[in-house]
């Protein structure tokens, strides 16, 4: 082979080698561009996801605010409801006390009339007209007492009971061997209670 042929062959090999290098460079550039494109696509997707999150967050915040407001309103409602129930109980109790006081005044005014009726029933007589009239008065007395008892009136027990200064008024001392010391031997005037309130203490004779 001549020097000329060797030179041509070397040039040809050099050209092929340069072509291969250039092809490799082009392939690398293409791969780099593809990678760049993928990265950009991923960045766009992440940005889109962030935008979605940013759009959802205000809704969640609003829901939380509404829930907090609902909880506060529920707490206020429960507090007001409890206060209203206490108010109703207080008013009911006051009304009951007022009714008791009103009945107390009325019954206190009636007691002297009851005393007079009972004194009239103690009068004795043989006349038939008198007996008939007394029987009628007795029926009226029983009806009145029963009606008052239905409304809370109670006769205070006396004879044979231990003297109690809260419900009895001692006006006479007695010396009766049939009774213990401090026991009531005789009732001089009836006493009455309205539920737990003393309308009038009983006047009694107490054994010494």
Swiss-Prot record:
Q: Which residues form a coiled coil?
A: none
- What are the recorded Gene Ontology BP terms? protein folding
Indicate, by first and last residue, each region the UniProt record lists as having compositional bias (Acidic residues).
42-51
Pfam entry (one): GrpE
In residue numbers, the region (Disordered) covers: 1-51
**Single Gene Ontology MF annotation:** unfolded protein binding
Compositional bias, Polar residues, is annotated for: 13-23
* Alphabetic keyword roster: Chaperone, Cytoplasm, Stress response
Q: Say if the entry is tagged with keyword Ubl conjugation.
A: no
Against InterPro entries, the record matches this protein to: GrpE (IPR000740), GrpE_coiled_coil (IPR013805), GrpE_head (IPR009012)
Localisation per UniProt entry: Cytoplasm
The reply to whether Chaperone figures as a keyword in the UniProt entry is yes
Q: What does this protein do?
A: Participates actively in the response to hyperosmotic and heat shock by preventing the aggregation of stress-denatured proteins, in association with DnaK and GrpE. It is the nucleotide exchange factor for DnaK and may function as a thermosensor. Unfolded proteins bind initially to DnaJ; upon interaction with the DnaJ-bound protein, DnaK hydrolyzes its bound ATP, resulting in the formation of a stable complex. GrpE releases ADP from DnaK; ATP binding to DnaK triggers the release of the substrate protein, thus completing the reaction cycle.
Q: How does it assemble?
A: Homodimer.
**What is the similarity comment for this entry?**
Belongs to the GrpE family.
The name of this protein is Protein GrpE
Per the UniProt entry, what species is this protein from, by scientific name? Staphylococcus aureus (strain NCTC 8325 / PS 47)
The taxonomic lineage of its organism, from the top, reads: Bacteria, Bacillati, Bacillota, Bacilli, Bacillales
